[in-house]
Amino acid sequence: MAQQDTDQQHPGVLPVDDEGFVVDSQDCEEREADWRGRGTSRPITVVGNPVLHKECEDVTDFGEEFQQLVADMFASQRTAEGVGLAANQIGVSKKVFVYDCPDDEGVRHVGVVCNPRLVELPADRRRLDDSNEGCLSVPTAYAPLARPDYAEVTGQDEKGNPVKVRGTGYFARCLQHETDHLYGYLYIDRLSKRERKDALRQMAENEPRYPVVAND
């Protein structure tokens, strides 16, 4: 992916390449550590919690309180050893997710997307990958799920600037998975009844390795 020219202007937090997609693979360690260092880890909501099963509210205020939310999300993601986290996974019904995720080439990507929309891709770009998928909100459970191995998301960055993110392989799966969360869908909602039942069985039989919010 080509880097932006040094004289190219972009109002966002991250630089962009020559196609307008964010370059989210630079300074990953420093950026993630900075966010995480300002945050407080929160417990993870699990399947059955109402906040996970409804569409979240758009982010319209990008002020100090929102910046703290993003920092808390990075801290929570690290505690739970996740590669992506949506706000409703820590109980906040806002359309924002964070990610710290490698692609299939091992390149690390770190960023924030608010009010995301998945770009509808033409059929010739929708090659399906049926790898296993898991979710912090369905702890210890995994199931194969077919998703396109390339994804593009449009939205806003943490300051409200327009942003475009794209990913391949595992990172593409992450972008789709986290966007789903913000519209009230878990990955198990895309499984067959039998596969969903098996995922919930896995969850019931094992203990999560991170703090979770108990359902009433």
UniProtKB/Swiss-Prot annotation:
> Coiled-coil stretches, from where to where?
none
State where Fe cation binds: C135, H177, H181
Q: Does the keyword Transport apply?
A: no
Kindly name one Pfam family recorded for this protein: Pep_deformylase
Question: What catalytic activity does the UniProt entry give for this protein?
Answer: N-terminal N-formyl-L-methionyl-[peptide] + H2O = N-terminal L-methionyl-[peptide] + formate
Q: Which UniProt keywords apply?
A: Hydrolase, Iron, Metal-binding, Protein biosynthesis
- GO BP terms in the entry: co-translational protein modification; translation
**Which superkingdom is the protein from?**
Bacteria
Q: Does this entry carry the keyword Zinc?
A: no
GO MF terms on file?
Answer: metal ion binding; peptide deformylase activity
Residues of the active site are: E178
Cofactor(s) listed: Fe(2+)
Q: Which InterPro entries match?
A: Peptide_deformylase (IPR023635), Peptide_deformylase_sf (IPR036821)
User: Which EC numbers characterise this protein's activity in its record?
Assistant: 3.5.1.88
Cofactor descriptive note: Binds 1 Fe(2+) ion.
Which Gene3D superfamilies does the record associate with it? Peptide deformylase (3.90.45.10)
Q: Which PANTHER family match?
A: PEPTIDE DEFORMYLASE, PEPTIDE DEFORMYLASE, MITOCHONDRIAL
Record function comment = Removes the formyl group from the N-terminal Met of newly synthesized proteins. Requires at least a dipeptide for an efficient rate of reaction. N-terminal L-methionine is a prerequisite for activity but the enzyme has broad specificity at other positions.
Q: Which family does it belong to?
A: Belongs to the polypeptide deformylase family.
**Protein name per Swiss-Prot or TrEMBL:** Peptide deformylase 4
What's the source species for this entry? Streptomyces coelicolor (strain ATCC BAA-471 / A3(2) / M145)
